[in-house]
Amino acid sequence: MAARLPLAACVVAFHLCLLLSSLVRSPSTALRRLSEAESSLVRHGHGVGIRPAYHFLPAKNWQNDPNGPMYHNGVYHMFYQYNPLGAMWQPGNLSWGHSVSRDLVNWDALDTALDPTAPFDYNGCWSGSATILPGGIPALLYTGRIDADKEVQVQNVAFPKNPADPLLREWVKPAYNPVIPLPADVPGDNFRDPTTAWVGRDGLWRIAVAAKVGGPNGIASTLIYRSKDFRHWKRNASPLYTSRAAGMVECPDLFPVAEPGVEEGRLGYASGPASGAVRHVLKLSVMNTTQDYYAVGRYDDVADTFVPEVDVERNADDCRTWRRFDYGHVYASKSFFDSSKNRRVLWAWANESDSQDNDIARGWSGVQTVPRKVWLDEDGKQVRQWPIEEIETLRSKRVVGLLGAQVNAGGVNKITGVGAQADVEAIFEIPSLEEAETFQPNWLLDPQKLCEENGASVPGKVGPFGLLVMASSNMQEHTAIFFRVFRHNQKYKVLMCTDLTRSTGRDNVYKPSYGGFVDIDIEQQGRTISLRTLIDHSVVESFGGGGRTCITARVYPEHAENKNSHVFVFNNGTGLVKVSKLEAWRLAMASVNVVHGR
């Protein structure tokens, strides 16, 4: 592949030189600063008790999809869907917010990178991706919404005005946009979200774009486009992947994964898929379920098609049966390759679950999950995720408690010293699995329903056991993250749940139960299972079984305004559970996009 890059480099460089005569400017000049009133609202206003302290969010207003995260010349860039005019989704106002960081934890806000100012995007600059071109020049591919009445979506490109600017503060849109117009066989409102581009063995660039082909009732498709110059794109005859049952998919993401024990950086790519000998992950966000699904499989880099490798209980042709990156309240995830540390990093949008009126009153809405490292599990069937190591720099006071403690049936033990801003790691040991309840096969494809019917307050045999977080002193409010173990075909099935039914005393809040199965052999693990939970006021991210199953939740306890939250270990099963490891840390506040007024 590297031998083919000079052809693409020469052609792309030629077209970049022509930009100065055909630019549509995107205004962006300085750090976005808060007025004194705005800064006061962020620090002291309504809802400050639930505002995250170390998760990524703008100082104010609405954000949704992560767009074009990248590492460039020593700086991390985060672009995101942003409404500069308020704390609600207004599709015609959507811009690309832009922040920069040296460590993926602390962020400085810049002015918006892309605003809906041109004929090819004047009803919204929607989601897309970043690609580092030969010569080190980044490019942004994004969806432009050009007709709100007819809902026409097209694909555009933008480049930095000054590539030598280390912060890439200003971006320009060539007047030759759109680079990909709406296809004749795709409805106007179903063509969006171009991926990071990659170069095939033939020297041509490729991107994938989500579409519904064949009309309003058409087939959910991930289309492939090819180009030699990053300007003129031609659609491939075959889609990368189709799913008739899915309706409409969004925000596709295709990337290679190294076999277990091999660093991803040795695959020899920096921005997209590698050769057909390497296994890949395809992620699709399904609009009618608002969930992200992925499969490990084979990408044919000649035909530009993807074949999922799925278990017998899953359907390769229906992506809604695939595994999920997160079984909680996240959507529109986007990954990038971090060349500085040879790792793939994943972001995802965690929307609010509160009422829109409360979002508006607070003045902000939407956060991103903590950035997660992603790699292929040893079983070759699933990926694992873990908070990037930089999150650990926020750890301050360390608490070691309950080590070796036995939690009897109905027991609740407090972890003293941590509350609403914490990182908790625990390993639970089950002395005996003999009493595990029998698993019913019809539970397999709906773990969330199983969690809803068997919440933390429902006693079981082996479980529920786990953590109670964001808990009030009287336990009337709490969020439960727990496991249940079932007997299944001479082995055991582990269910992980996050139960929000008692997360708040308020009624106008979405309080579901989330759930996913943890694909491990708990007997081979010595009858143990691990849980790591990051607590950040209204955000609770949990990683079960070493990151094989992840659940993110948004919670809004009334007691949070009093800043008096607690963490407990609990066991509501009939058998005892041993806490063989428990470490917890208070986490410091990160500096995230808050700049005091002038």
From Swiss-Prot:
Entry GO MF terms: fructan beta-(2,6)-fructosidase activity
Keyword Electron transport: no
Secretion signal, residue range per the UniProt entry: 1-30
Function: Hydrolyzes levan-type beta-(2->6)-linked fructans to fructose, but not inulin-type beta-(2->1)-linked fructans.
Keywords in alphabetical order: Disulfide bond, Glycoprotein, Glycosidase, Hydrolase, Signal
Residue positions with a glycan: 93, 288, 351, 572
Regulation: Not inhibited by sucrose.
Distribution of this protein across tissues and organs: Expressed in leaves, stems, roots and inflorescences. Maximum expression is detected in stems, particularly the penultimate internode.
Disulphide linkage map: 451-497
Record-given protein name: Fructan 6-exohydrolase
Pfam assignment, any one: Glyco_hydro_32N
Reactions this protein catalyses: Hydrolysis of terminal, non-reducing (2->6)-linked beta-D-fructofuranose residues in fructans
A single BP term in Gene Ontology: carbohydrate metabolic process
Enzyme class, spelled out: hydrolase
Species of provenance: Triticum aestivum
InterPro entries: ConA-like_dom_sf, Fructan_Metab_Enzymes, Glyco_hydro_32, Glyco_hydro_32_C, Glyco_hydro_32_N, Glyco_hydro_beta-prop_sf
